[in-house]
Amino acid sequence: MFSKLAHLQRFAVLSRGVHSSVASATSVATKKTVQGPPTSDDIFEREYKYGAHNYHPLPVALERGKGIYLWDVEGRKYFDFLSSYSAVNQGHCHPKIVNALKSQVDKLTLTSRAFYNNVLGEYEEYITKLFNYHKVLPMNTGVEAGETACKLARKWGYTVKGIQKYKAKIVFAAGNFWGRTLSAISSSTDPTSYDGFGPFMPGFDIIPYNDLPALERALQDPNVAAFMVEPIQGEAGVVVPDPGYLMGVRELCTRHQVLFIADEIQTGLARTGRWLAVDYENVRPDIVLLGKALSGGLYPVSAVLCDDDIMLTIKPGEHGSTYGGNPLGCRVAIAALEVLEEENLAENADKLGIILRNELMKLPSDVVTAVRGKGLLNAIVIKETKDWDAWKVCLRLRDNGLLAKPTHGDIIRFAPPLVIKEDELRESIEIINKTILSF
């Protein structure tokens, strides 16, 4: 009987497939006597042995990235069609962002918020003017931004709306994903996220996504302080709501004095072809959450944007983070935002996203049953059979030189860095087409 480690090693070797561009360069005997850099199999084995088993990565071991490309430890080159879940919208290791990090890292990296630093205010002024909000609360990760929004909503509910203390409720849409802390999974409808981790956060209600009548019923409760929603549900499989949904959300929240919280951590920052996905319907949320591409993938940076009547309900000592607003993260975030502006990446995402979806819709319907998305946040739904499923498609895409990852079993997300050019996109489409037709 195989041990778990032996089983993993066997799985990794089999699932990596045969790369036609790479022949076995050394014999088994040579490998035993010659020390060299770790192989992909070495890396799979080491992670399995020493790391927690809380992820199921596609078996590819990466060591370098530039722009839209990644290279593994054997030197194979790939198109990146995940963009680290839309964290590298500006492309891997964008020189402007890298140089900003390098210029700051030798000066000052962390002061905590016990003292002022000379970069935070510059960043705060830039991002608030860019998105037209009074204030920003800087954090590090996306889930921290979500937690911050929930605290703001509750505090606002008590101090402004007049909800009885500790009775405030926040409404979420089914299928949401904003992290894996206890608060985040308390709002989740995905058993993989929440099963076995209760008891859960009280005061969280869940309604169907893209369902305005359900939202209207939920907001009849005077204890509801906020509705938090993704303009497009990313982790759920790039679920795009009906036209007018976000306008309806804005109208209902205004009517019932409820905060509209837009989770733009994956959809924002040019990914969908607009600076924010809510811009498609010209609505202004009360609170906006940003993260991921806010640093271009170089450093964890997130942000919560809102106006004074909400932000100033939190007083000194009531919320914060040792690393939130540190000068290194702020300098990186300024550069990352400037790249999005200077290179017109929202416009590029809009234009190329239309091309991508038009081509994906030509794929055979007996394999691909749906195509959806906006800008360069897209997904296909794979019809699973005994011969293929989304995981097998992603393995073959990898073998053909393109990296993507399944979500929720039968869905593959296609989200390349926004710096991709049309000829590169069309080359990628050829790989996708070739792969799908091979099943």
Curated annotation (Swiss-Prot):
It is an enzyme of class 2 (transferase). It is found in: Mitochondrion matrix. The keyword Transit peptide applies. Changing residue 436 to N: In HOGA; loss of protein stability; loss of ornithine aminotransferase activity. InterPro entries: Aminotrans_3, Aminotrans_3_PPA_site, Class-III_PLP-dep_AT, Orn_aminotrans, PyrdxlP-dep_Trfase, PyrdxlP-dep_Trfase_major, PyrdxlP-dep_Trfase_small. It holds the Pfam family Aminotran_3. Its main location: mitochondrion. One of its GO terms (molecular function) is ornithine aminotransferase activity. Changing residue 402 to P: In HOGA; may affect protein stability; loss of ornithine aminotransferase activity. Changing residue 154 to L: In HOGA; no effect on protein abundance; loss of ornithine aminotransferase activity. Keywords: Acetylation, Aminotransferase, Disease variant, Mitochondrion, Pyridoxal phosphate, Transferase, Transit peptide. CDD domains: OAT_like. Its EC number is 2.6.1.13. Residues 1-25, 1-35 form a transit peptide. The modification N6-(pyridoxal phosphate)lysine is found at residue 292. Pathway: Amino-acid biosynthesis; L-proline biosynthesis; L-glutamate 5-semialdehyde from L-ornithine: step 1/1. The modification N6-succinyllysine is found at residues 102, 107, 362, 405. Changing residue 199 to Q: In HOGA; loss of protein stability; loss of ornithine aminotransferase activity. One of its GO terms (cellular component) is mitochondrion. Changing residue 104 to R: In HOGA; loss of protein stability; loss of ornithine aminotransferase activity. PANTHER family: AMINOTRANSFERASE CLASS III, ORNITHINE AMINOTRANSFERASE, MITOCHONDRIAL. Catalyzes the reversible interconversion of L-ornithine and 2-oxoglutarate to L-glutamate semialdehyde and L-glutamate. NCBIfam families: Orn_aminotrans. Homohexamer. This is Ornithine aminotransferase, mitochondrial. It comes from Homo sapiens.
